[in-house]
Amino acid sequence: EGDWLDGNITGQGIAAYANGVTYEGEFRNAMHNGTGTMTSPGGYIYEGSWINGTKEGEGKITYPDGAVYQGNLKSGTRDGVGTLTMADGLVYSGEWVDGEIQGAGSLTQPNGDVYEGSLVDGKREGEGVATYANGDVYQGSFLNDRRHGTGTFTGTDGYVYVGEWAEGLIEGNGQVTYPDGSVYVGTFANNVANGTGKITYPNGSTYEGDWENGVINGSGIATYDNGLTYEGMFLNAQYDGQGTMTYADGYVYEGQWAQGQRNGLGRATYADGTVYNGDFLNGQRNGQGEITLPDGFTYVGGWQDGVIDGTGIATYANGDVYEGSFVRGRREGEGTMRYATGQESVGTWSDGALVSETGQGN
């Protein structure tokens, strides 16, 4: 029903088709041409421009599920620049090619996340900026709808990562600044430090070396704000294995560690020149060991809780030599003292003194 020209449907009119589709608008030579509205029984509605029976130019499509597209069409498909609003709240505004989201655009998710940048086949791909509903921001490369390549993630809590990504995860080389001000530079895997890297803490302390699954593990060097340094093996962020600890006052320990404590065989050199070689347990001299003091005193034998305890040989600065039992650093029990003069006392000792002599000699 409508206008005719020279026997052809041309001008304004209304057409109702056998399949239930209706069209109201402009015609030329019996084809939709110009501006018109097509309504399908299923709820699909197109309002806009037509050329020779094909949707072409500016138009608005309302889909049966409530989604709405407003923008350019070419050869009946979304092509050019347009905005799609989904019933669930998703909104895309940007470029389209052959009916697909393709090119530069802005994508707003129902939860409030917003992406602005390049898209391919409806997915984030190329350079873009994602602003999340909680305020976090990612700026960088995407591939197949995930962060991939190089990019910067800035969290509202102060966490900032700059570096490489793979399939949505922090992976490769990068730098992260933590909310407490600590800075890590190195390699990552599965979103955490993994491989080799250096962390610098706000107080100036540092660790440089191996990492595993976000934890200090392997070989590395730790420096502390009090001047202390440790170089050696770590396990679960504790000194464990072989390592050297150097204090600012000159004390140096080289040897075995376990769970952050000196444990096993080691060598301790003290600031005054004293040297101990032997066993340690829980950070204390314990077991068998040898100590040499700057004044010439030496002791070889048993230790417990950091002090001489057990059986051993003590050589004093004056040349006297005691061989026997010690308790808490004092001669205690059976022992023999060989004096520098050549005299010898054999017997029982208590609190460092001979209390019962069983033999003597020259």
Residue map of PLM features:
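Conserved anchor residues at repeat-unit boundaries in beta-strand-based tandem repeats, strongest
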Residues: 1-10, 22-33, 46-56, 68-79, ...
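Short beta-strand elements of solenoid repeat domains
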Residues: 1, 14-17, 24, 37-40, ...
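Short, low-complexity, Pro/Ser/Thr/Gly-rich segments in the mature regions of secreted, periplasmic
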Residues: 353-362
